[in-house]
């Protein structure tokens, strides 16, 4: 099961509820894993901290948008812009940090292209 968290606080869902409460609802269910998606990598660190206290495997698929908060107003993805500061090296570093904190599922969401995933794969398998 995947959740979207606030950009400013990865412990809160975009709708305002606590991530921890949502995870608790499904921790004893047949759901295989917990994921965070469509949030900036920096916000997901606090989500990873929350997910570590539950029994299911977990991970994250961050996006590379400047912000998705504008969707709350305009509800139109065409207004979203790609970040210029999230290069491949920084993305891979963020993913390795998640893995170091026990995430077993990592990848990318919007604006994270194949070259990012290829670099992540190479880093995981070559080190």
Task: Describe these PLM feature segments.
Residues 1-127:
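Domain-level signal for soluble alpha/beta catalytic cores
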